[in-house]
Swiss-Prot record:
Protein name: Glycerol-3-phosphate acyltransferase 2, mitochondrial
Subcellular localization, as worded in the UniProt entry: Mitochondrion outer membrane
Catalytic reactions of this protein: sn-glycerol 3-phosphate + an acyl-CoA = a 1-acyl-sn-glycero-3-phosphate + CoA; a 1-acyl-sn-glycero-3-phosphate + an acyl-CoA = a 1,2-diacyl-sn-glycero-3-phosphate + CoA; 1-(9Z-octadecenoyl)-sn-glycero-3-phosphate + (9Z)-octadecenoyl-CoA = 1,2-di-(9Z-octadecenoyl)-sn-glycero-3-phosphate + CoA; 1-(9Z-octadecenoyl)-sn-glycero-3-phosphate + (5Z,8Z,11Z,14Z)-eicosatetraenoyl-CoA = 1-(9Z)-octadecenoyl-2-(5Z,8Z,11Z,14Z)-eicosatetraenoyl-sn-glycero-3-phosphate + CoA
A GO molecular-function annotation: 1-acylglycerol-3-phosphate O-acyltransferase activity
GO cellular component, one term: mitochondrial outer membrane
GO biological process: CDP-diacylglycerol biosynthetic process; glycerol-3-phosphate metabolic process; glycerophospholipid metabolic process; phosphatidic acid biosynthetic process; piRNA processing; triglyceride biosynthetic process
TM regions (residue ranges): 306-332, 450-472
Keywords: Acyltransferase, Membrane, Mitochondrion, Mitochondrion outer membrane, Transferase, Transmembrane, Transmembrane helix
Motif (HXXXXD motif): 205-210
Region span, Acyltransferase: 180-290
Pathway: Phospholipid metabolism; CDP-diacylglycerol biosynthesis; CDP-diacylglycerol from sn-glycerol 3-phosphate: step 1/3
One Pfam entry name: Acyltransferase
Gene name in the database record: Gpat2
Length: 801
């Protein structure tokens, strides 16, 4: 391949490939391809079942196997049949007529009900110590309450809602090819709504457009007008005023004041009363659990946790008997408003800037067939009350990363402590801190649990599969016919793991659609015999492909963790460049594998892994090991003197039983019995295993290489510095390394921030107050070059070159 790309004819084609490339994109490659059946015949996995450990009753009651066969609908496909009228004119005005026929429930006087709320009344009467109403005239306090309430919400305007839904439907049809929604998932939500509990949709946040798309999708399916909790940082004051009239909710700035602030107490009381009024009136609520796109930082949204805490508080106080939580996820081929530069915070979106962005987008889409596909996923609803009761029994002791991993990194200890990792990067808001400590912990773990369910239910789009193949297997280029075969293989591997894909159709059409969406990051070159070569563009193009490939990581996450753990176990025994047969000779004991998997689990951020809080690390280790065996990478090896795997005779109980708070419901009972030395495994010698093993290891390479380069960056002595300044310097260092080594997938601001926060948790960096603000310092433990080298060596053992 390298020789073919470096030949003189190909270099000449590359120099003047602009016109030829345009013809290649428009001609459909000029090749005859076979059809693809990406759903393994009639089988299509149904994703999004709720947790059977935390919500067993919801798991049984809101699901029936018949809903799996209901198929999909295109939400934005509105025709004459979707209206009550027929005729030539109706076919041209069907969008407008459809918006007029949508049912918008009449809203009661919410402001009056909020003013009559017990918490607000106590402040008005001066019964709350330290609140703004103490010692003030009730009329003045009432005006302040109305001002705060006006900042939070206004009564939705039916005319504006109909006009906006018509305009949005027209815009979405020109922006997207389709917006697919599973009818069975929608049937589950309708069934949950009939039980009488208010619906609270908890969603991922891939795009700023989610705040418009999701309410429109649910509104079109007969769920009424959603109240959407939005971030005031992303909107200008004029846009916030418009969005309030369309159902938007915004936290007042006073709500984030200190707990003893009188203005903060009043604002938080009004916000609580607003949420209680929404829940009692049965209006559905949409909360985003992820931070807005374009803001480097923690994955879990502090604002989302604040709104979710208000819902939990209302249920705990008995304001409503229960609330039904619905995890939601949106998957795009390409995110429409993905920021090009993620190193700086985005400016708030205004009315004129938003209108200009829409106009530019429409101009780009005019006469263009590069529109993206969208999938909206609604996971199985579950009861908040049931989760609250069952989840508390899953809580156990936790320790910081410094106590768990630092002694092992420095070689002071070899035993991994038998406890879970405590890692929380999302800063708490005053609304969350106002709750009891036990409820704060409940909200944090519930948000992580729901976000994990949302990500697990999200389908894998064709761009993620194509980007993964180009980034991890073919950075130097690949023949199109080979790429299509591997595309089909990776699609089937995704489906076999119980994850859905967001595409269907012929392989030729899928390839043309996907590569046309990625044309800014790949190059097509024609070679002899009519075939084509697909070459990723170096530089920022690889960084973009790395971001797309992260969408595929949850599908193979367990195997990727296991493969990197095996790589770390073999690092001290076999040279990394050694042949696969030599690595397959080594015996890997079960205890050694467990230890390496645990070390890697502790090192990787929870924002990346998204483990369910009800699952212990040891259960996850067993799951990783089972996955490696199922995919054929590991084969059991019976050592001399060990019990055969088929021996089911009575065994002695182990002297130490590791009872985990989550309960281990695995089918295997081997954890309760002694096995001398444990089971042993070898790497499989099948011909496909070396490439698949390398593929799995490279899935985690971007973050592991970024961590290793961050450890190297410690040698340069750039501390002390502020966290923002140090993250910018680290990003510049990653970009410089990318230019030298060609590892552009590591030059990502989110990876730089993750490395800094992980090093803070590990005790490598310390944050010390100073007159100019908090400053990052190198801890005394890692001030020596030897300990810095140990840290880098510990990280690099998991990286497969």
């Amino acid at each position: 391949m390298e020789t073919m790309l470096k030949s003189n004819p190909q270099m000449q084609q590359r120099n003047n490939h602009s016109g030829q490339e345009t013809s290649l994109w428009s001609s459909g490659f000029g090749m005859k391809m076979e059809a693809i059946t990406p759903f393994l015949g009639k089988y299509r996995p149904f994703m999004g079942r709720c947790c059977q450990t935390c919500t067993p009753k919801s798991w049984e009651s809101l699901f029936h196997r018949s809903i799996m066969d209901l198929g999909f609908c295109n939400v934005i496909l509105v025709k004459e049949e979707n209206t009550r009228f027929r005729g030539w004119l109706v076919r041209r005005l069907c969008y407008f007529l459809w918006s007029l026929e949508q049912h918008i429930p009449t809203s009661s006087d919410a402001s009056q009900m909020i003013m009559e709320n017990t918490g607000v009344q106590n402040i008005l009467l001066g019964k709350v110590p330290g609140a703004a109403g103490e010692g003030q005239a009730p009329d003045l306090v009432k005006k302040e309450v109305q001002r705060i309430l006006g900042h939070i919400q206004t009564t939705p305007r039916p005319f504006l809602l109909r006009l906006f839904s018509w305009a949005l439907l027209w815009f979405l049809n020109r922006l997207f090819l389709n917006v697919q929604l599973h009818k069975g998932q929608m049937k589950m939500v309708h069934k949950a709504a009939q039980e009488g509990s208010p619906l609270v949709f908890l969603s991922t946040h891939k795009s700023l457009l989610d705040g418009f798309l999701l309410p429109f999708v649910l509104f079109s399916q007969g769920l009424g007008v959603l109240r959407v909790a939005l971030d005031s940082r992303t909107c200008s004051p004029a846009l916030r005023a418009l969005l309030r009239k369309l159902g938007g909710l915004f936290l007042p700035p006073e709500a984030n004041l200190s707990l003893d602030s009188s203005e903060g107490i009043l604002a938080r009381a009004v916000v609580r009363a607003t949420v209680e009024q929404l829940l009692t009136s049965g209006q559905p609520l949409l909360i985003f659990l992820e931070e807005a796109p374009g803001y480097p930082g923690p994955r879990l949204s502090a604002l989302g946790q604040a709104w979710l805490g208000l819902v939990v508080q209302a249920v705990q106080a008995g304001i409503v008997p229960d609330a039904t939580l619905v995890p939601v996820a949106t998957a795009y081929d390409l995110v429409p408003d993905a920021p090009c530069n993620m190193t700086h915070d985005l400016a708030p979106l205004g009315l004129w800037t938003g209108a200009l962005a829409i106009f530019r987008r429409l101009c780009n889409c005019w006469g263009c067939n590069r529109r993206v596909c969208v999938r909206v996923h609604l996971a199985q609803p579950f009861s908040l009350q049931e989760y609250t009761i069952n989840a508390r029994s899953c809580w156990g002791s936790r320790q910081t990363l410094e106590h768990l991993l630092q002694p092992i990194v420095l070689g002071e200890c070899s035993v991994v402590p038998d406890t879970e990792k405590e890692q929380e990067w999302t800063p708490p808001t005053s609304l969350l801190l106002a709750l009891k400590e036990e409820d704060q912990l409940l909200v944090r773990r519930l948000s992580r649990h729901v976000l994990s369910a949302s990500v697990a239910s999200s389908a894998v789009m064709s761009t993620a599969i194509m980007a993964t193949l180009l980034l991890l297997k073919h950075q130097k280029g690949v023949v199109l016919s080979q790429l299509l075969g591997e595309f089909s293989w990776l699609t089937e591997e995704t489906l076999l793991r119980g994850f859905d894909v967001g595409f269907s159709g012929q392989l030729r059409c899928l390839a043309q659609h996907t590569l046309s969406l990625l044309r800014a990051h790949v190059v097509l070159l024609r070679v002899h015999q009519g075939d084509l070569v697909v070459v990723p563009r170096p530089g920022p193009g690889l960084t973009h492909l790395a971001r797309l490939s992260m969408e595929l990581l949850p599908t193979f996450l367990s195997e990727a963790v296991g493969a990197c753990a095996v790589r770390g176990l073999l690092a001290g025994r076999v040279p990394p460049e050694g042949p696969w047969e030599l690595q397959g000779i080594e015996l890997l004991s079960q205890n050694e594998l467990y230890r390496q998997i645990l070390l890697l689990l502790h090192l990787l951020p929870q924002d990346l892994l998204l483990p369910q809080p009800c699952q212990s690390s040891y259960c996850y280790c067993q799951e990783v090991l089972d996955r490696l065996i199922q995919c054929g990478l590991l084969v059991a090896e019976e050592t001399p003197g060990s019990r055969p795997a088929c021996d089911t005779g009575r065994q002695h109980l182990s002297a130490k039983l590791l009872w985990k708070p989550s309960g281990d419901f695995t089918d295997s009972e081997s954890d309760d019995f002694e096995e001398p030395g444990g089971r042993c495994f070898r790497l499989s010698q099948q011909s496909r295993c070396p490439d698949f093993f390398l593929f799995l290891c490279r899935l985690l390479s971007p973050i592991l290489k970024a961590f290793a380069q961050a450890a190297t960056f410690l040698h340069l002595g750039q501390l002390p510095d502020s966290e923002v300044g140090y993250s910018e310097k680290l990003l510049q260092f990653l970009q410089a390394c990318a230019q030298e080594e060609g590892i552009f997938e590591c030059a990502d601001p989110n990876l730089a921030i993750s490395a800094i926060w992980t090093f803070k948790d590990l005790g490598v960096l310390q944050q010390i107050p100073s007159p100019t603000g908090p400053q990052l310092h190198l801890s005394p433990t890692f001030a020596s070059r030897d300990n810095q080298d140990k840290l880098e060596q510990f990280i690099r053992q998991f990286i497969c070159s």
